[in-house]
Amino acid sequence: TALELSTKIRANRETIGAIDFDKPESKVVVDENGEVLDIVLRERGISERLIEDFMLSANEVIGEHFYWMQVPFIYRIHEEPKMEKLRQFFDIAASLGYRTKGKIEEIEPYMLANMLRKFKGEVVETMLSTILLRTMNQARYSINNIGHFALATKYYTHFTSPIRRYPYLLVHRMIRTYLFNGDVSDQTIDNFITRLPDLAESSSEYEKRAVDCEREVDRMKKCEYMLKYQEQTFRGIVSSVTNFGVFITLERSNIEGLVHIKAMNDDYYTYDQKNMLLIGRRKKKVYRLGDEVIVKVANVDLENQEIDFKILKHKSLISKK
């Protein structure tokens, strides 16, 4: 069956070390006027995963086929992670009890995939996955095939959704030209060699703009929603720690807000960048990833798309071990 085939494809991807960032996403529920009714966690069903498995496999097959045809083509490439940020990720993970084998300088996808499996299902899973994701370079389009690091594959392209993304449509045109029409003439090759670099670069740039726009709308709708809940309390998890405060992600909705260090007036806190900790100088209270908190919505700034929380209760992740 299709499900059995999908399961085998996914198992094979895990075997070769593909990295699966299965992060929870928010779903914004709006009425006919665009007013936010609710924000809930989006659930990925079996059918969605099945389609994703087949799409990934199809993209690999097309990418490899045209690589060996040695014709101008557009690939979806993904370079190795940024080493400095990767070291910080491993330091933070180690401080929480998760260590990996092997040299960071010789990083391979399977090492990161194994690390993700170590804390799968744990309270810190989403936070550590997010930090790891931020170490990654953004995938982009290029005529030079260097493989796709996160997918642990040597060949990859995008062609499965030509009705909604230009690079996919462009790949379809090349498939039609090279395969269906059998046109690999010098004129055609020269035309693609001339045009593809700019098309790949502009496609990558416009994709980045679209992602930024989507994130901005997401933040805007979350702020609109939280305006209704000022001064109300929520359960959350410490999702990031910085030198200017701690970010809290609410459990039910995945909405994130900041507790600024100026609002943490029970002590004077110093920042441990290596382990991503805020440590109280007098009381030695420590804020770290995964800590459970109860927060109050202190302020919502629609113009700057910022949500401020105030911590009412704090339970350390370490205290539960």
Model-predicted segments: where are they?
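Beta-strand/loop nucleic-acid-binding surfaces
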Residues: 254-286
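Electropositive polyanion-binding surfaces
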Residues: 1-265, 290, 296-321
